[in-house]
């Protein structure tokens, strides 16, 4: 077995250790070893294999130490073995030379343009050489693209050498590209590394070829977007841009806000399955022993974060990495009005529950049960996920109502990698932050997921249920008994 084959076997074994479900493992293996199209014509079978692409921005590259850059190169090499090719865009911390001229917006003669290009070679291209050399030392087939220029037009910056760059990727090379732009009138235009990254993503997204941009990676000393709920400046684990972008952006520092805006603009151009990773240079280093906890490699393997965003904060490790997805909007309907005013489609919820649980749900009997105590309905996207919370009255006289998670369901086709269950669970906990309870059968394969997110758990002595609860409120023995009374008294509403 060759060293490359042995490394690939190690990665495949890592999949089995790191994924939580067979569905996730099968999904990755399908990407790594795509099945041939049975309907393919003889001519189509000779086409180049599909290119799965990651576009990586190396921010402040001149401040990244050589050994750190070498470790990042090992990560890029591992990504390539896992079927993900890379385009690297190194960026300088401060605008110099040509970038400063671009910022002035002044027009120039052809001679001046050529002179400024020479300045670029001495300032910016030296970093292209450095990055390429170190990546090669790390085992990456890196190729600096000195002549890759971009065109500036009304739509922004676009890549002019698409086909050449695509051929480079198809041949297994990693392209390291610079940041120079001249518009058709030879008028120098301001350009930033973010515009270059966006231009590359836009160009490949619009390109009618066998290539898909699956990841945007931003390696920046500031790391992921900080989360106020997490200690010591730890980052958001996962951001649902469809739900959180507008409210999150104004709260961030200028650098974090720039990175968030770049990610949002790029993911808007890409398929819903694409994702972005924002992390630090140190976290991006691969040393061989960090495969299962490496934020980039783990995500390539599983489409997930290293740990879930819906875990209790005090049980989550510190992180400087944020995974971002276009995600899905979350809609909340409070109280019982949504039972009758048409704001919620109960027919679609019935279909969702049947699909998720693979059972037939008795919706008329269920609606009768909740018509006086429905507290909240949470709908994810186009009825891709749902949570139904009721307020249940314990048997103890004068006891406070118990918030009860009656139903949590996700369509089967989006289970596993979409994080919809996490988004819905987080939304629920944001409303019922003090306490909420739910129950599960002892043989439910989802119980591991429930254990990780609960503050406590207890077996019922009289029914086949396990009680779970979470929230900031500390539950004493009396309150826990009230929880048990609630879960024991509710009758299931399944037909079969």
From Swiss-Prot:
Tell where it localizes. Answer: Mitochondrion
The signal peptide here is none
Keywords noted in UniProt: Acyltransferase, Amino-acid biosynthesis, Mitochondrion, Transferase, Transit peptide
Q: Where are the transmembrane segments?
A: none
As recorded in UniProt, its EC number(s) are 2.3.1.1
Query: In what residue span(s) does the N-acetyltransferase domain sit?
Result: 333-493
Substrates-to-products reaction catalysed: L-glutamate + acetyl-CoA = N-acetyl-L-glutamate + CoA + H(+)
Q: What is its main location?
A: mitochondrion
Q: Which domain of life is it from?
A: Eukaryota
Q: In which pathway does it act?
A: Amino-acid biosynthesis; L-arginine biosynthesis; N(2)-acetyl-L-ornithine from L-glutamate: step 1/4
PANTHER family the UniProt entry points to = AMINO-ACID ACETYLTRANSFERASE, MITOCHONDRIAL (PTHR23342:SF4), N-ACETYLGLUTAMATE SYNTHASE (PTHR23342)
Sum up the protein's function in the record's words: N-acetylglutamate synthase involved in arginine biosynthesis.
Protein name in UniProt: Amino-acid acetyltransferase, mitochondrial
